[in-house]
Amino acid sequence: MCVYSDLASFASVRLFAKELLEKDIHVDILILNAGMQTGDELTLSEDGVEMLYQVNHLSQFLLTRLLLPTLSHTSDRIARIVHVSSSMHYIGQIDRDAYNSSALNSINSTRRTSFQSYSDSKLMNAVFSNSLDRFFRQEGNEQYSGISSVSIHPGFVVSDLDRGLPSHMEVILRTIRSLVARPTIDGAVTQVTAATHPQLLAHGGGLYFEDQCIMSHCTSCLLCSIDKKRGVGVIPHGSATSFEDQDWLWDTSSAIVGLSNF
């Protein structure tokens, strides 16, 4: 079944979720793969929100929250949420002045370039993923005990991500991608592996994975990589594990998309 949704529209996201909920479909895997890049000029969605912020984070936050009933439908089945972040999240910031509700339709001086904004949005993916997994483990949320949430860097892949950039930048990046990026056909390997690999599933959620080990299918590497505390995964940006940043992003995003906190 194919259901259309436009992440530049909160109404479209809500309609998409409504259709799935009405069909009583159980979702075993949710891969949040949508993303865009823009130029430095201000571009607003129909909701009056800066477009990149909405597509790359807010609509994915809204969709995930709305679909939780389909993910927690039965206690004897596990579900996995995979947030497609990026290694660029390491240079991102959770800037509370730039991303609060009063700065959604104006270019704030803290939002310097489109690349900084993109990096910020990819950090939000990692922060939200960890926040979500932490929520699933809290007392009283046993109905979500079978769900885990992880974030990943898919690698440098041939794609249309650059189409929102100024034409000269798009040409440059397309050329670079054609020379050194992974073929599009391989672009989903990291996402699918993170969602289905038995040994990764056994480690639960709240993790961040880079593409290198996953792409090489190296099981031993997956189980002894950089994050020695967990024994698996890669250590993400500090904000991804900061409860303070997690709570701020959750509360702010909930208010913007019109959802109450649990």
Predicted features and spans:
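Rossmann-fold NAD(P)H-dependent dehydrogenase/reductase core
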Residues: 1-163, 259-260
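Intrinsic disorder
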Residues: 7, 11, 43, 181, ...
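A generic structural signal for short coil/turn motifs at secondary-structure boundaries
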Residues: 39-40, 218, 236-239
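Short coil/turn segments at secondary-structure junctions
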Residues: 47, 51, 111-112, 116, ...
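Short, flexible, mixed-charge acidic loops at enzyme active sites
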Residues: 94-103, 164-168, 218-230
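Alpha-helical membrane-targeting segments
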Residues: 108-115, 156-158, 162-186, 221-222
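A generic structural signal for secondary-structure junctions
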Residues: 166-170, 199, 258
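C-terminal helical subdomain
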Residues: 174-234, 243-247, 251, 255
